[in-house]
Amino acid sequence: MARKTLRARRFFSLIFPFFFITSVYAEQTPESAKTVTVEAKNEMFAPQHPDQYQSWKATSEQSAREDALAEDPRLVILWAGYPFSRDYNKPRGHAYAVTDVRETLRTGAPKTAEDGPLPMACWSCKSPDVARLIQQEGEDGYFHGKWARGGPEIVNDLGCADCHNTASDDFAQGKPALTLSRPYAERAMEAIGKPFDKAGRFDQQSMVCGQCHVEYYFDGKNKAVKFPWDEGMKVENMEQYYDTIAFSDWTNSLSKTPMLKAQHPEYETWSAGIHGKNNVTCIDCHMPKVQNAEGKLYTDHKIGNPFDNFAQTCANCHTQDKASLQKVVAERKQAIHDLKIKVEDQLVHAHFEAKAAWDAGATDAEMKPILNDIRHAQWRWDLAIASHGIHMHAPEEGLRMLGSAMDKAADARTKLARLLATKGITHEIPLPDISTKEKAQKAIGLNMQQINAEKQDFLKTVVPQWEDQARKNGLLSQ
Protein backbone atom coordinates (compact mmCIF):
# COMPACT_ATOMS: atom_id res chain seq x y z
CA MET A 1 0.00 0.00 0.00
CA ALA A 2 2.81 2.36 0.88
CA ARG A 3 4.56 1.48 -2.39
CA LYS A 4 1.38 2.30 -4.38
CA THR A 5 1.00 5.60 -2.54
CA LEU A 6 4.61 6.50 -3.31
CA ARG A 7 4.11 5.69 -6.97
CA ALA A 8 0.96 7.80 -7.02
CA ARG A 9 2.81 10.73 -5.48
CA ARG A 10 5.59 10.42 -8.04
CA PHE A 11 3.02 10.28 -10.83
CA PHE A 12 1.26 13.44 -9.69
CA SER A 13 4.57 15.20 -9.00
CA LEU A 14 5.47 14.60 -12.64
CA ILE A 15 2.10 15.23 -14.22
CA PHE A 16 0.94 18.22 -12.11
CA PRO A 17 3.45 20.71 -13.60
CA PHE A 18 2.24 19.65 -17.04
CA PHE A 19 -1.37 20.46 -16.15
CA PHE A 20 -0.24 23.74 -14.58
CA ILE A 21 1.72 24.77 -17.66
CA THR A 22 -1.15 23.72 -19.90
CA SER A 23 -3.63 25.80 -17.91
CA VAL A 24 -1.39 28.87 -18.00
CA TYR A 25 -0.99 28.73 -21.78
CA ALA A 26 -4.69 28.03 -22.16
CA GLU A 27 -5.34 31.40 -20.55
CA GLN A 28 -3.19 33.07 -23.20
CA THR A 29 -4.64 31.44 -26.30
CA PRO A 30 -5.90 33.74 -29.04
CA GLU A 31 -9.49 32.66 -28.43
CA SER A 32 -9.47 33.74 -24.79
CA ALA A 33 -7.65 36.97 -25.66
CA LYS A 34 -10.39 38.07 -28.05
CA THR A 35 -12.79 39.47 -25.47
CA VAL A 36 -13.48 42.84 -27.07
CA THR A 37 -15.27 45.61 -25.18
CA VAL A 38 -14.58 48.45 -27.62
CA GLU A 39 -17.62 49.42 -29.70
CA ALA A 40 -16.26 51.38 -32.66
CA LYS A 41 -19.56 52.32 -34.31
CA ASN A 42 -20.09 55.85 -33.05
CA GLU A 43 -23.81 55.94 -33.85
CA MET A 44 -24.40 53.28 -31.19
CA PHE A 45 -23.96 55.99 -28.56
CA ALA A 46 -26.26 58.57 -30.17
CA PRO A 47 -29.37 57.67 -28.12
CA GLN A 48 -27.43 57.86 -24.85
CA HIS A 49 -25.46 61.04 -25.65
CA PRO A 50 -27.48 62.87 -28.34
CA ASP A 51 -25.98 66.35 -27.91
CA GLN A 52 -22.42 65.11 -27.93
CA TYR A 53 -23.09 62.85 -30.90
CA GLN A 54 -24.77 65.52 -33.02
CA SER A 55 -22.02 68.04 -32.30
CA TRP A 56 -19.41 65.37 -33.15
CA LYS A 57 -21.21 64.74 -36.46
CA ALA A 58 -20.99 68.47 -37.16
CA THR A 59 -17.22 68.12 -37.66
CA SER A 60 -18.28 67.07 -41.17
CA GLU A 61 -19.03 70.76 -41.76
CA GLN A 62 -15.27 71.38 -41.56
CA SER A 63 -14.95 69.97 -45.07
CA ALA A 64 -12.64 72.38 -46.89
CA ARG A 65 -9.38 70.94 -48.16
CA GLU A 66 -6.38 73.27 -48.15
CA ASP A 67 -3.46 72.09 -50.26
CA ALA A 68 -0.34 73.00 -48.28
CA LEU A 69 1.99 72.05 -51.15
CA ALA A 70 0.18 74.33 -53.59
CA GLU A 71 0.33 77.13 -51.05
CA ASP A 72 4.05 76.57 -50.41
CA PRO A 73 5.89 74.53 -53.10
CA ARG A 74 9.15 74.70 -51.13
CA LEU A 75 7.77 71.84 -49.05
CA VAL A 76 8.05 69.50 -52.03
CA ILE A 77 11.82 70.00 -52.07
CA LEU A 78 12.22 69.64 -48.33
CA TRP A 79 10.33 66.33 -48.45
CA ALA A 80 11.87 65.03 -51.69
CA GLY A 81 11.87 61.24 -51.66
CA TYR A 82 9.12 61.07 -49.02
CA PRO A 83 5.36 60.58 -49.58
CA PHE A 84 4.63 64.06 -48.19
CA SER A 85 6.13 65.51 -51.39
CA ARG A 86 3.20 64.00 -53.28
CA ASP A 87 0.36 65.24 -51.15
CA TYR A 88 -0.08 67.25 -47.97
CA ASN A 89 -3.33 68.93 -46.96
CA LYS A 90 -3.99 70.97 -43.86
CA PRO A 91 -6.18 69.25 -41.24
CA ARG A 92 -9.96 69.29 -41.39
CA GLY A 93 -12.84 67.79 -39.37
CA HIS A 94 -12.50 64.52 -37.48
CA ALA A 95 -15.38 63.14 -39.55
CA TYR A 96 -12.96 62.86 -42.47
CA ALA A 97 -10.20 60.95 -40.68
CA VAL A 98 -10.71 57.64 -42.48
CA THR A 99 -11.65 59.25 -45.80
CA ASP A 100 -8.55 61.41 -45.86
CA VAL A 101 -6.08 58.64 -45.04
CA ARG A 102 -7.62 56.53 -47.80
CA GLU A 103 -7.56 59.33 -50.34
CA THR A 104 -4.16 60.87 -49.67
CA LEU A 105 -1.51 60.03 -52.23
CA ARG A 106 0.83 59.25 -49.35
CA THR A 107 -0.79 55.87 -48.69
CA GLY A 108 -0.30 54.75 -52.28
CA ALA A 109 -2.59 52.48 -54.28
CA PRO A 110 -2.24 48.97 -52.83
CA LYS A 111 -3.96 46.11 -54.63
CA THR A 112 -3.66 43.50 -51.87
CA ALA A 113 -3.37 43.38 -48.09
CA GLU A 114 0.39 42.87 -48.42
CA ASP A 115 0.92 45.70 -50.91
CA GLY A 116 1.72 49.39 -50.59
CA PRO A 117 4.37 51.74 -49.17
CA LEU A 118 3.15 52.27 -45.60
CA PRO A 119 2.65 50.14 -42.47
CA MET A 120 -0.46 49.41 -40.40
CA ALA A 121 0.69 52.07 -37.94
CA CYS A 122 -0.59 54.77 -40.32
CA TRP A 123 -4.14 53.98 -39.18
CA SER A 124 -3.32 54.54 -35.52
CA CYS A 125 -4.86 57.99 -35.11
CA LYS A 126 -7.81 57.56 -37.44
CA SER A 127 -10.48 55.43 -35.82
CA PRO A 128 -11.86 53.71 -32.71
CA ASP A 129 -11.47 50.52 -34.73
CA VAL A 130 -7.77 50.81 -33.86
CA ALA A 131 -8.56 50.41 -30.15
CA ARG A 132 -10.84 47.50 -31.03
CA LEU A 133 -8.15 45.77 -33.08
CA ILE A 134 -5.48 46.28 -30.42
CA GLN A 135 -7.82 44.72 -27.88
CA GLN A 136 -8.61 41.88 -30.27
CA GLU A 137 -5.14 41.17 -31.70
CA GLY A 138 -2.77 42.67 -29.16
CA GLU A 139 -0.35 45.46 -30.09
CA ASP A 140 2.04 43.20 -31.98
CA GLY A 141 -0.83 41.71 -33.93
CA TYR A 142 -2.31 45.10 -34.74
CA PHE A 143 0.95 46.64 -35.97
CA HIS A 144 1.92 43.64 -38.08
CA GLY A 145 1.79 44.12 -41.83
CA LYS A 146 1.01 46.79 -44.38
CA TRP A 147 -1.49 49.63 -44.17
CA ALA A 148 -3.79 47.92 -46.67
CA ARG A 149 -4.35 45.03 -44.25
CA GLY A 150 -6.42 47.35 -42.09
CA GLY A 151 -8.66 48.57 -44.91
CA PRO A 152 -11.64 46.28 -44.23
CA GLU A 153 -11.24 46.65 -40.45
CA ILE A 154 -10.66 50.36 -39.82
CA VAL A 155 -13.81 51.97 -41.14
CA ASN A 156 -15.35 54.18 -38.44
CA ASP A 157 -14.17 57.76 -38.06
CA LEU A 158 -12.47 59.10 -34.93
CA GLY A 159 -15.08 59.08 -32.24
CA CYS A 160 -16.42 57.99 -28.89
CA ALA A 161 -14.25 54.99 -28.01
CA ASP A 162 -11.04 56.80 -28.92
CA CYS A 163 -11.37 59.00 -25.83
CA HIS A 164 -13.98 57.36 -23.59
CA ASN A 165 -14.27 53.98 -21.90
CA THR A 166 -17.64 53.38 -23.50
CA ALA A 167 -18.03 49.97 -21.84
CA SER A 168 -17.76 51.40 -18.32
CA ASP A 169 -20.54 52.03 -15.82
CA ASP A 170 -19.39 55.65 -15.55
CA PHE A 171 -19.98 56.23 -19.26
CA ALA A 172 -23.39 54.57 -19.04
CA GLN A 173 -24.25 57.01 -16.24
CA GLY A 174 -23.30 59.99 -18.39
CA LYS A 175 -19.84 60.61 -16.93
CA PRO A 176 -16.85 61.30 -19.23
CA ALA A 177 -15.00 58.05 -18.40
CA LEU A 178 -11.90 59.36 -20.17
CA THR A 179 -9.35 56.77 -21.21
CA LEU A 180 -6.15 56.29 -23.16
CA SER A 181 -7.30 53.76 -25.74
CA ARG A 182 -3.80 53.42 -27.21
CA PRO A 183 -1.41 51.49 -24.92
CA TYR A 184 1.64 53.12 -26.51
CA ALA A 185 0.27 56.54 -25.49
CA GLU A 186 -0.16 55.33 -21.92
CA ARG A 187 3.47 54.19 -21.83
CA ALA A 188 4.61 57.53 -23.24
CA MET A 189 2.76 59.48 -20.54
CA GLU A 190 4.38 57.28 -17.91
CA ALA A 191 7.80 58.02 -19.45
CA ILE A 192 7.32 61.74 -18.74
CA GLY A 193 6.02 61.10 -15.23
CA LYS A 194 2.31 61.41 -16.01
CA PRO A 195 0.63 58.04 -15.46
CA PHE A 196 -2.93 58.45 -16.68
CA ASP A 197 -4.61 56.62 -13.81
CA LYS A 198 -2.98 58.97 -11.28
CA ALA A 199 -3.65 62.18 -13.21
CA GLY A 200 -6.36 64.65 -12.29
CA ARG A 201 -9.28 65.28 -14.59
CA PHE A 202 -7.76 68.41 -16.11
CA ASP A 203 -4.55 66.61 -17.00
CA GLN A 204 -6.51 63.68 -18.37
CA GLN A 205 -8.48 65.96 -20.67
CA SER A 206 -5.33 66.98 -22.50
CA MET A 207 -3.67 63.57 -22.27
CA VAL A 208 -6.60 62.05 -24.16
CA CYS A 209 -5.98 64.51 -27.02
CA GLY A 210 -2.27 63.78 -26.66
CA GLN A 211 -2.80 60.21 -27.84
CA CYS A 212 -2.80 61.52 -31.40
CA HIS A 213 -1.82 65.18 -31.42
CA VAL A 214 1.83 64.37 -30.80
CA GLU A 215 5.14 63.62 -32.45
CA TYR A 216 5.71 59.90 -32.95
CA TYR A 217 7.70 57.47 -35.06
CA PHE A 218 7.49 53.86 -36.21
CA ASP A 219 9.81 51.69 -34.16
CA GLY A 220 11.41 48.36 -35.00
CA LYS A 221 10.65 45.75 -37.62
CA ASN A 222 6.96 45.82 -36.77
CA LYS A 223 6.77 49.61 -37.26
CA ALA A 224 5.00 50.11 -33.94
CA VAL A 225 4.06 53.64 -32.86
CA LYS A 226 6.34 55.17 -30.21
CA PHE A 227 6.61 58.70 -28.86
CA PRO A 228 10.25 59.94 -28.69
CA TRP A 229 9.92 61.33 -25.18
CA ASP A 230 12.52 59.25 -23.35
CA GLU A 231 14.80 62.31 -23.03
CA GLY A 232 12.00 64.88 -22.71
CA MET A 233 9.52 66.71 -24.94
CA LYS A 234 11.50 69.74 -26.14
CA VAL A 235 12.72 69.77 -29.72
CA GLU A 236 16.34 69.27 -28.63
CA ASN A 237 15.38 66.36 -26.35
CA MET A 238 13.62 64.50 -29.14
CA GLU A 239 16.42 65.31 -31.57
CA GLN A 240 18.95 63.80 -29.15
CA TYR A 241 16.78 60.71 -28.76
CA TYR A 242 16.53 60.19 -32.52
CA ASP A 243 20.26 60.78 -33.00
CA THR A 244 21.13 58.31 -30.24
CA ILE A 245 19.15 55.49 -31.87
CA ALA A 246 20.28 56.60 -35.37
CA PHE A 247 16.68 56.88 -36.56
CA SER A 248 15.55 58.55 -39.76
CA ASP A 249 12.16 58.60 -41.47
CA TRP A 250 13.67 58.74 -44.94
CA THR A 251 16.64 60.00 -46.95
CA ASN A 252 16.12 63.21 -48.90
CA SER A 253 16.55 62.25 -52.54
CA LEU A 254 18.43 65.46 -53.40
CA SER A 255 20.86 65.97 -50.51
CA LYS A 256 20.99 62.34 -49.28
CA THR A 257 20.33 63.61 -45.77
CA PRO A 258 18.84 61.10 -43.29
CA MET A 259 15.76 63.10 -42.36
CA LEU A 260 13.21 63.33 -39.58
CA LYS A 261 9.57 64.14 -40.33
CA ALA A 262 7.63 65.77 -37.51
CA GLN A 263 3.97 64.83 -37.30
CA HIS A 264 1.52 67.03 -35.36
CA PRO A 265 3.13 67.86 -32.00
CA GLU A 266 0.32 69.85 -30.43
CA TYR A 267 0.67 68.19 -27.03
CA GLU A 268 4.37 69.02 -26.84
CA THR A 269 3.98 72.62 -27.99
CA TRP A 270 0.89 73.23 -25.86
CA SER A 271 2.83 71.94 -22.85
CA ALA A 272 5.58 74.48 -23.55
CA GLY A 273 3.19 77.42 -23.89
CA ILE A 274 1.36 79.68 -21.46
CA HIS A 275 -1.90 77.74 -21.70
CA GLY A 276 -0.29 74.40 -20.92
CA LYS A 277 1.76 75.85 -18.08
CA ASN A 278 -1.42 77.26 -16.54
CA ASN A 279 -3.38 74.04 -16.97
CA VAL A 280 -5.71 75.47 -19.60
CA THR A 281 -6.61 72.25 -21.38
CA CYS A 282 -7.39 71.38 -24.98
CA ILE A 283 -11.02 70.90 -23.90
CA ASP A 284 -11.26 74.40 -22.41
CA CYS A 285 -10.49 75.99 -25.77
CA HIS A 286 -11.61 73.48 -28.41
CA MET A 287 -14.54 71.65 -26.73
CA PRO A 288 -16.26 74.12 -24.40
CA LYS A 289 -19.43 73.60 -22.42
CA VAL A 290 -22.44 74.92 -24.35
CA GLN A 291 -26.22 74.80 -23.91
CA ASN A 292 -28.67 72.73 -25.91
CA ALA A 293 -32.16 73.88 -26.87
CA GLU A 294 -33.49 72.95 -23.43
CA GLY A 295 -30.77 74.91 -21.67
CA LYS A 296 -28.81 71.85 -20.58
CA LEU A 297 -25.02 72.12 -20.55
CA TYR A 298 -22.97 69.61 -22.52
CA THR A 299 -19.45 69.38 -23.97
CA ASP A 300 -19.39 70.54 -27.58
CA HIS A 301 -17.74 67.81 -29.65
CA LYS A 302 -17.47 69.94 -32.77
CA ILE A 303 -13.77 70.43 -32.16
CA GLY A 304 -12.72 73.70 -33.74
CA ASN A 305 -11.36 77.22 -33.50
CA PRO A 306 -11.84 78.77 -30.03
CA PHE A 307 -12.88 82.06 -31.66
CA ASP A 308 -15.99 80.31 -32.99
CA ASN A 309 -17.19 79.99 -29.37
CA PHE A 310 -15.50 83.07 -27.96
CA ALA A 311 -17.90 83.62 -25.05
CA GLN A 312 -17.49 80.03 -23.85
CA THR A 313 -13.72 79.83 -24.41
CA CYS A 314 -11.41 82.84 -24.50
CA ALA A 315 -13.76 85.13 -22.57
CA ASN A 316 -13.62 82.84 -19.56
CA CYS A 317 -10.09 84.09 -18.87
CA HIS A 318 -9.38 87.10 -21.10
CA THR A 319 -10.82 90.56 -20.58
CA GLN A 320 -9.99 91.76 -24.11
CA ASP A 321 -12.70 91.70 -26.74
CA LYS A 322 -12.70 89.19 -29.58
CA ALA A 323 -11.32 91.58 -32.20
CA SER A 324 -8.38 92.57 -30.00
CA LEU A 325 -7.40 88.97 -29.31
CA GLN A 326 -7.79 88.03 -32.97
CA LYS A 327 -5.40 90.83 -33.87
CA VAL A 328 -2.79 89.57 -31.38
CA VAL A 329 -3.08 86.00 -32.67
CA ALA A 330 -2.90 87.13 -36.30
CA GLU A 331 0.29 89.08 -35.61
CA ARG A 332 1.89 86.06 -33.94
CA LYS A 333 0.82 83.82 -36.80
CA GLN A 334 2.32 86.20 -39.34
CA ALA A 335 5.61 86.43 -37.43
CA ILE A 336 5.92 82.64 -37.37
CA HIS A 337 4.95 82.40 -41.04
CA ASP A 338 7.55 84.97 -42.10
CA LEU A 339 10.37 83.20 -40.26
CA LYS A 340 9.13 79.83 -41.52
CA ILE A 341 9.51 80.96 -45.14
CA LYS A 342 13.01 82.32 -44.50
CA VAL A 343 14.10 78.99 -43.02
CA GLU A 344 12.56 77.08 -45.92
CA ASP A 345 14.45 79.21 -48.45
CA GLN A 346 17.72 78.37 -46.71
CA LEU A 347 16.87 74.67 -46.57
CA VAL A 348 15.90 74.52 -50.25
CA HIS A 349 19.28 75.96 -51.17
CA ALA A 350 21.04 73.61 -48.76
CA HIS A 351 19.47 70.50 -50.31
CA PHE A 352 20.43 71.53 -53.86
CA GLU A 353 23.91 72.63 -52.77
CA ALA A 354 24.43 69.29 -51.05
CA LYS A 355 23.39 67.55 -54.27
CA ALA A 356 25.93 69.64 -56.16
CA ALA A 357 28.62 68.64 -53.66
CA TRP A 358 27.84 64.95 -54.12
CA ASP A 359 27.84 65.39 -57.89
CA ALA A 360 31.26 67.06 -57.62
CA GLY A 361 32.71 64.04 -55.83
CA ALA A 362 32.28 64.86 -52.15
CA THR A 363 32.94 61.95 -49.80
CA ASP A 364 30.79 60.59 -47.00
CA ALA A 365 33.26 61.92 -44.44
CA GLU A 366 33.16 65.41 -45.96
CA MET A 367 29.37 65.45 -46.10
CA LYS A 368 28.55 63.96 -42.70
CA PRO A 369 28.71 67.16 -40.59
CA ILE A 370 26.86 69.08 -43.30
CA LEU A 371 24.05 66.54 -43.51
CA ASN A 372 23.79 66.55 -39.74
CA ASP A 373 23.22 70.31 -39.79
CA ILE A 374 20.58 69.95 -42.52
CA ARG A 375 18.88 67.17 -40.55
CA HIS A 376 18.77 69.23 -37.36
CA ALA A 377 17.70 72.42 -39.13
CA GLN A 378 14.80 70.79 -40.93
CA TRP A 379 13.73 68.83 -37.86
CA ARG A 380 13.49 72.01 -35.78
CA TRP A 381 11.68 73.83 -38.58
CA ASP A 382 9.28 70.92 -39.02
CA LEU A 383 8.42 70.54 -35.35
CA ALA A 384 7.52 74.23 -35.32
CA ILE A 385 5.37 74.25 -38.44
CA ALA A 386 3.81 70.77 -38.18
CA SER A 387 1.96 72.01 -35.09
CA HIS A 388 -0.56 74.10 -36.98
CA GLY A 389 -1.70 76.00 -33.91
CA ILE A 390 1.69 76.88 -32.51
CA HIS A 391 1.04 80.61 -32.96
CA MET A 392 -1.71 80.14 -30.35
CA HIS A 393 -0.26 77.34 -28.22
CA ALA A 394 3.35 78.47 -27.86
CA PRO A 395 4.36 81.34 -30.17
CA GLU A 396 7.60 82.07 -28.31
CA GLU A 397 8.66 78.42 -28.54
CA GLY A 398 7.74 78.38 -32.23
CA LEU A 399 9.94 81.39 -32.94
CA ARG A 400 12.74 79.93 -30.84
CA MET A 401 12.70 76.65 -32.78
CA LEU A 402 12.60 78.45 -36.12
CA GLY A 403 15.46 80.72 -35.09
CA SER A 404 17.50 77.68 -34.12
CA ALA A 405 16.61 76.05 -37.45
CA MET A 406 17.83 79.15 -39.29
CA ASP A 407 21.17 78.97 -37.47
CA LYS A 408 21.62 75.29 -38.31
CA ALA A 409 20.71 75.85 -41.97
CA ALA A 410 23.22 78.72 -42.14
CA ASP A 411 25.89 76.45 -40.65
CA ALA A 412 25.17 73.83 -43.30
CA ARG A 413 25.35 76.33 -46.15
CA THR A 414 28.60 77.87 -44.86
CA LYS A 415 30.22 74.43 -44.74
CA LEU A 416 28.83 73.61 -48.18
CA ALA A 417 30.28 76.79 -49.68
CA ARG A 418 33.72 75.89 -48.34
CA LEU A 419 33.44 72.29 -49.52
CA LEU A 420 32.20 73.28 -52.98
CA ALA A 421 35.12 75.69 -53.29
CA THR A 422 37.55 72.80 -52.76
CA LYS A 423 35.85 71.09 -55.71
CA GLY A 424 36.35 74.15 -57.92
CA ILE A 425 32.75 75.38 -57.62
CA THR A 426 32.56 78.99 -56.50
CA HIS A 427 29.41 80.12 -58.31
CA GLU A 428 25.95 80.06 -56.77
CA ILE A 429 24.17 76.74 -57.27
CA PRO A 430 21.12 77.48 -59.44
CA LEU A 431 17.67 76.32 -58.41
CA PRO A 432 15.14 74.83 -60.81
CA ASP A 433 11.77 76.52 -61.20
CA ILE A 434 9.80 75.47 -58.14
CA SER A 435 7.28 78.30 -58.24
CA THR A 436 4.32 75.89 -58.24
CA LYS A 437 3.63 72.53 -56.67
CA GLU A 438 3.58 70.89 -60.09
CA LYS A 439 6.94 72.36 -61.11
CA ALA A 440 8.54 71.41 -57.80
CA GLN A 441 7.25 67.84 -58.11
CA LYS A 442 8.64 67.63 -61.62
CA ALA A 443 12.00 68.93 -60.35
CA ILE A 444 12.32 65.97 -57.97
CA GLY A 445 11.25 63.46 -60.61
CA LEU A 446 7.70 62.63 -59.54
CA ASN A 447 5.34 61.29 -62.22
CA MET A 448 2.20 62.80 -60.75
CA GLN A 449 -0.02 61.76 -63.66
CA GLN A 450 0.75 58.11 -62.99
CA ILE A 451 0.53 58.49 -59.19
CA ASN A 452 -2.89 60.16 -59.43
CA ALA A 453 -4.21 57.60 -61.93
CA GLU A 454 -3.17 54.70 -59.71
CA LYS A 455 -4.84 56.34 -56.72
CA GLN A 456 -8.11 56.87 -58.55
CA ASP A 457 -8.16 53.24 -59.61
CA PHE A 458 -7.56 52.20 -55.99
CA LEU A 459 -10.42 54.37 -54.75
CA LYS A 460 -12.80 52.97 -57.38
CA THR A 461 -11.91 49.30 -57.00
CA VAL A 462 -10.29 48.49 -53.65
CA VAL A 463 -12.04 50.83 -51.18
CA PRO A 464 -15.57 49.66 -52.10
CA GLN A 465 -14.43 46.09 -51.44
CA TRP A 466 -13.17 47.15 -48.01
CA GLU A 467 -16.51 48.71 -47.13
CA ASP A 468 -18.51 45.72 -48.39
CA GLN A 469 -16.40 43.40 -46.28
CA ALA A 470 -16.75 45.66 -43.23
CA ARG A 471 -20.55 45.64 -43.56
CA LYS A 472 -20.65 41.87 -43.92
CA ASN A 473 -18.59 41.59 -40.74
CA GLY A 474 -20.85 43.98 -38.84
CA LEU A 475 -18.19 46.65 -38.45
CA LEU A 476 -20.18 49.30 -40.31
CA SER A 477 -23.86 50.08 -39.97
CA GLN A 478 -25.83 48.96 -42.99
Swiss-Prot record:
Main location, first listed in the record: periplasm
Record-listed heme c 2 binding positions: 160, 163-164, 301
Stretch forming the signal peptide: 1-26
Homology family: Belongs to the cytochrome c-552 family.
Free-text comment on the cofactor: Binds 1 Ca(2+) ion per monomer. Binds 5 heme c groups covalently per monomer.
GO biological process: anaerobic electron transport chain; nitrate assimilation
Localization of this protein: Periplasm
Highest taxon, organism lineage: Bacteria
GO molecular-function terms, A-Z: calcium ion binding; heme binding; iron ion binding; nitrite reductase (cytochrome, ammonia-forming) activity
Disulphide-bonded residues: none
Source species of the chain: Salmonella typhimurium (strain LT2 / SGSC1412 / ATCC 700720)
Protein name: Cytochrome c-552
Function noted in UniProt: Catalyzes the reduction of nitrite to ammonia, consuming six electrons in the process.
Keywords from the UniProt entry: Calcium, Electron transport, Heme, Iron, Metal-binding, Oxidoreductase, Periplasm, Signal, Transport
Cofactor(s), by name: Ca(2+); heme c
Binding site for substrate: 216, 264
Binding-site residues, heme: 122, 125-126
One cellular component (GO) term of this entry: outer membrane-bounded periplasmic space
